[in-house]
């Protein structure tokens, strides 16, 4: 049976950075040094060969200008005395041969004396017989040699012979090989220095890369990108100059920024971002800024900015932020569910008490009183709860209203749901959360306005028609002063004293974000009435 292996084991792990760099640099060094070696060796070979040839030519020219050689060529080969002179020079300069010939190529000297008087062997002497110096590689009686030829002239500048000098080719090759070894050792030394430098470079790179391999860096980068784009919080990163270097999708949505449409570069965003969030203090002192509230394009954002350090040096900052309105919606949605649960719990205790009463009447066999009690209880439920659940189809809104009715009762006031109210459930959580925020704020404001003296009355009307929910909240409290009613929805304006006036501003913002509207009427000492209109997906939820 074949066992499956983990994915990481099946993947072929890329070559390590150190191995890759060493191999690449070694290959480049080897290629460069090989080319240098070939070129340099070729030049050294030519220079060595030319140097030996020039040395031989210098000796040949000296002999050609010698009076003894000129005079000797006027005699017979065996009587000329040239052999003794040539052999002395040959041995002194470690040459293979020195041959002096007349114009008929007859030898006047040779390392093998018996060949004196015989013709010179080789066609490479012909140029010299015609008055031209010549260098050639050829083989005579002795060995393969590098041979040079120089014409000999008398006092009247008439050519009377040729001096031929030979260098054993193996000697030339030996000198070239000796030079070649010095080149090879230089190349090997260069390779060694290059490898040592490469190892040092690899160590420096590994330190810069925190010991990570390239494929690990690639994996971390992909994971970082996936993480940044998957979180709901907006993320904006800046460098030590305050220039934006990174922005994730959530931040683009919250800031209404689209790179493909608004900017081809982040420079414009960097300028606007520095005006919205002051990161200079964070970059200068490294002091984090936490839980700051800023407003961007009618959105209330909760932002945290922290410095980014590398080796103790601040190299940038990261800001994370989230729509605070959304956070409040979630909290209010949770409050609605909690209120619904509390209302059910309270009603369960109430019904438990009523069941105990029914059980007691059964034991006492007071059937007439039992009948009256059950009928009264059923009527009360129908009036208070049954009618509400029949009109309000959203369990969350129903539970919320029940909790507010109970709260008003506990405070000695009355909260009434208008008999004409009808509210279908909505498929939009934003709409439900906004309605809970709106009703909660308006009802709580009304309860505070009614004060501790009991007997106040609050009425709520919810009417759905053609995709719109019309909501009215009335109370018979003290009303709103005329000088404040026009600014009642402004942030910081309140009838409850200082450090208040946020709730209605938030309600207005949420209602308008949905495309709705809110208005107020009030007559001091008589009433206050709020009118709210928001879109409501009631028809969609009933499909």
Curated annotation (Swiss-Prot):
Gene3D superfamilies: 1.10.287.130, Histidine kinase-like ATPase, C-terminal domain, PAS domain. Changing residue 107 to A: Abolishes the stimulation by fumarate to the same extent as complete deletion of the dcuS gene. (R)-malate binds at residues 107-110, 121, 140-142, 147. The chain crosses the membrane at residues 21-41, 182-202. The modification Phosphohistidine is found at residue 349. Residues 346-538 form the Histidine kinase domain. Autophosphorylated. The phosphoryl group is rapidly transferred to DcuR. SUPFAM superfamilies: ATPase domain of HSP90 chaperone/DNA topoisomerase II/histidine kinase, PYP-like sensor domain (PAS domain), Sensory domain-like, Sporulation response regulatory protein Spo0B. Changing residue 248 to A/D/G: Causes constitutive active state of the kinase, leading to constitutive expression of a target gene, without addition of C4-dicarboxylates. NCBIfam families: PRK11086.1 (NF008298). Changing residue 304 to D: Causes constitutive active state of the kinase, leading to constitutive expression of a target gene, without addition of C4-dicarboxylates. This is Sensor histidine kinase DcuS. It is an enzyme of class 2 (transferase). GO terms for cellular component: cytosol; outer membrane-bounded periplasmic space; plasma membrane; protein histidine kinase complex. It catalyses: ATP + protein L-histidine = ADP + protein N-phospho-L-histidine. The lineage of its organism: Bacteria, Pseudomonadati, Pseudomonadota, Gammaproteobacteria, Enterobacterales. Residues 212-323 form the PAS domain. The keyword Cytoplasm does not apply. Keywords: ATP-binding, Cell inner membrane, Cell membrane, Kinase, Membrane, Nucleotide-binding, Phosphoprotein, Transferase, Transmembrane, Transmembrane helix, Two-component regulatory system. The periplasmic domain is involved in C4-dicarboxylate binding and sensing. The structural disorder in the cytoplasmic PAS domain has an important role in signal transduction to the kinase domain and may be the decisive structural feature that characterizes the activated kinase. The keyword RNA-binding does not apply. The region encompassing approximately residues 42 to 181 has been shown to be periplasmic, however exactly which residues are periplasmic is not clear. Its EC number is 2.7.13.3.
